[in-house]
Amino acid sequence: METLQNSYIYFVSDFILIFGVILSAFIGLHIKNLAPKWHLRLLNTILALMLLGFLPFLTGFLKLTNLDIFSNLVPFTDYNLTFHSGSVNITPLNLFFKFLITLCAFITSLLSFGFVKKLNRKISNFTSLFLISLLGGYGVCISNDFITLFLSVEILSVALYFLIASFYNKKDKEKNSLEASVKYFIINEVASCFMLLGISYIYLNLGTINFSDINTIAINKILPSTPLLNIGEILFFLALTFKIGAFPFYIWLMDVFKGSNYSIGLFISSVIKTVGAAALIKTGSSLGCFNSVLSFALILCACITLVIGNLIAARIVKKEGDIKDFLASSSISNIGYVLLGIAFFTKSSITASIFFLIVYLISNFGLWAAFMLVVRNLRKFILKSETSKYETDYGAKKLYVDENLGAIKGVAYISPFFATLVVICLLSFAGFPVMAGFTAKFYLFSNILRSGIFSVYPLLFAAFASILAVYYNFKIISFMFQKPDRLKIYKKKPVFNRVNIYIFILSMAALLLIAGFFLSTPVINILNNFI
């Protein structure tokens, strides 16, 4: 046990985040005419400083790669500290998840500039709510009891309600943001009731809400498992499946994505998914030790999530449906793999799940950046063509205003380099050999298979889902190389000239290629030492 006064270094990023929330709220209240770009620059600066707060732990992370070039570094990750009567816990894994969600938030902020700057006076609300939701994510990562975890989840969720609704504009494409926010609020409150009921049953049976105490009880078999405990565990984890958009609470994800801004969808598919995975690992490692009922329930949820998510994605791609619907269904299907690894509650399977989550985030950011660039250019073209002859002669508005997957047809003819980068991201999602997605799936499946003979059955569902993923990802690739019917329209479309997004997509594509060959082993070594 250490006192907080002697351990400020572990909370540098937290202090910067709290200061950022206060500063952004103060600027929003007292500096009314500040341009939107300065609010976004402030947000990016705060997030960058938060990332710098993790530098003291970098040597320890590099040391754990077991690479010779880092062998002389001094590790700074051998600790397990608790604060505030055991309600807060600092471990290497907790710090890693804090770093991961901060990095995801920073990338989301950078990619969202073109979609957020139109908020004008409401931009200060966006920056404040964005940081408050991140504060809730931090609380989830360092929580060590159910009450701290629940309060942190609610802070994140309440901020997200208003964050979604802040884009409401009945004249714009995000006119359904208010409806999406209300839907998310109602369903989330139902899930919160399940979570509280589950926590009460767990406390009634075990007499504690502290994760460390529960883990001690489970390992030493001090108290037997009871039906009441099983019900409490299932209710609690059902509520968590809502937070990550897994079966049976996954429909909200598509509604929220469809009605909200692209930046909100990216935030949910990256930061919220990562926070949900951290909560599942944190609580599952304690409660999963009692019996196999919880493990079976989560495996069932994961298998159904995998199949449903990929079936929905395949149907959307076949019909050339809405881009946001496809991104939502892809998010649902990929979180199923993460949940499947966590559900077995073994060190190797959890390590494989976290590695898959990292690869998913890289692929996800690359794909979202690509689609956001396509949509931005698409909206510019429609805006410019509304009073020109191209709308009349070629039906530009009719063809592209829906922002569906058909909008990427012929992209390879406009920018072959851009199309190649998108292909790399899609191949990783499909699990194509030599790509990081293939390495992550292979490592996940092999570790699940070692869990026992019954692990074969969930892998059959995962294999079927992977086949579906290959189908629809290759279908999207084929769209980009299809020659458009009206080539004149594409010639008039603006060139993909956003250099910063190009560089970002190139970086993500390079990571996916390099990770498939070289980076997988060092990253897995780090994760093995964390768990």
How does the language model describe each region?
Residues 1-531:
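Alpha-helical transmembrane segments of multi-pass membrane proteins predominantly involved
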